[in-house]
Amino acid sequence: MKLIGITGMPGSGKSAITKLAEKYKIIVVSMGDVVRHETSKQGLTLNPENVGNTAVKLREIHGNEAIAVPCLNYVNEKYKNEDFVIIEGIRSIYEVNYLGKNAKLDIIAIHSSPKTRFERLSGRNREDDSNDWNTFVERDERELNFSIGNVISLADYMVVNEGNYMDFINNLENTLKKIIKAD
């Protein structure tokens, strides 16, 4: 099995991979779902502060691989016979190292400017998103503290999502095809 990791700052367009994955019959597992599940399990409201604090606490208690370990265990239990599995939402270099030690891994980074991402998040209406600029900046700082900047800069592929949505989807699909073809 080969893992295709998707990384990018909140609102960059990481979830767009889901539609492409359906087209190519590739399973998508979201690392963010692991954190949101743990937040809910603790009886906390899903909002940027609680979800972010849960991610920090999980890493403090269980180490820097705290999200990657249960995510990969889940993939190995449920999807071990798949040729490809997409792991959406990789945040830290420790997660990359852990996943790369335990499976073949390529990373796609999706990049959008802060202004573009804020506009998207303000209109997305997901419980853990915010339409407040200061909360948005705090979330970005928390993500950067996880070392997501290192993951983005060391990614195998970079797709920019700043303009036309269909151009972005075409570029993302071409990148996905390169990875599939190379394997």
UniProtKB/Swiss-Prot annotation:
Signal peptide: none annotated. Keywords: ATP-binding, Nucleotide-binding. Pfam families: AAA_17 (PF13207). The keyword Magnesium does not apply. The keyword ATP-binding applies. ATP binds at G8, M9, P10, G11, S12, G13, K14, S15. One of its GO terms (molecular function) is ATP binding. PANTHER family: DEPHOSPHO-COA KINASE (PTHR41930:SF1), UPF0200 PROTEIN MJ1399 (PTHR41930). Belongs to the UPF0200 family. This is UPF0200 protein MmarC5_0311. It comes from Methanococcus maripaludis (strain C5 / ATCC BAA-1333).
